[in-house]
Design a protein with these regions (language model features):
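Conserved AdoMet
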Residues: 1-75
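Short, well-ordered amphipathic alpha-helices
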Residues: 58-63, 85-95, 118
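Extended basic-aromatic, gly/pro-enriched interface segments that bind polyanionic ligands
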Residues: 98-166
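Active-site micro-motifs of SAM-dependent methyltransferase domains
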Residues: 10, 94, 111
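Conserved class I S-adenosyl-L-methionine
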Residues: 69-87, 101-105
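Helix N-cap/coil-helix junction residues
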Residues: 17, 97-98
Length: 166
């Protein structure tokens, strides 16, 4: 309850509404970008690269031992800022080694986190679960003002299609 109150209180201040009742009434009578801001305010975005590492081991084994006609189609729901879909894409690319086509769609209801995911820029420290071999294969390290940052390489970025669903 406190989390919802806190998050929506910010929306009230930014939109100039005096109460939750006024704000929700206004939302019900207006289509437009504030609906997406409302959704974004209520989402929680907890993610990391190779979170629940054993899941990726199971996925790799599954991909290597199964054949599929027409290629793999994978959906990553609640993609957040992209760490999990990129982890899935790395696992797929390593496991299939271009033997089978794949399509990975990553969706979320929060447009702001998806914009971040599409950029594919992360703090190097957030890749603690990504080994050095993967880091070199799939990421570009920042230099100068961007030192301590990484960007996904085009090969990895192109393996994921990000979609806002809501």
């Amino acid at each position: 309850h406190a989390m919802v109150y806190s998050r929506l209180s910010r929306r009230l201040r930014e939109t100039g509404h005096a109460s939750f009742h006024d704000y929700l009434g206004w939302l019900q009578n207006h289509d437009g970008p504030e609906w997406q801001e409302f959704v974004n305010a209520l989402t929680t975005n907890l993610t990391s690269f190779f979170r629940e590492h054993h899941h990726f081991e199971i996925l790799a084994k599954y991909l290597k031992t199964r054949s599929v006609t027409g290629g793999w189609r994978i959906w990553c729901n609640a993609a957040s800022t992209g760490e999990e879909p990129y982890s899935i894409a790395m696992t797929v690319m390593e496991s299939l080694q271009a033997r089978t086509a794949s399509q990975l769609v990553a969706s979320d209801i929060d447009s702001k986190v998806l914009a971040s995911a599409e950029k594919g820029v992360y703090r190097l420290e957030s890749l603690k679960n990504v080994g050095e071999e993967r880091l070199q294969r799939f990421f570009l390290r920042g230099t100068g003002a961007n030192e301590g940052m990484v960007r996904v390489k085009p090969e990895l970025r192109q393996a994921v299609q990000f979609v806002n669903v809501n």
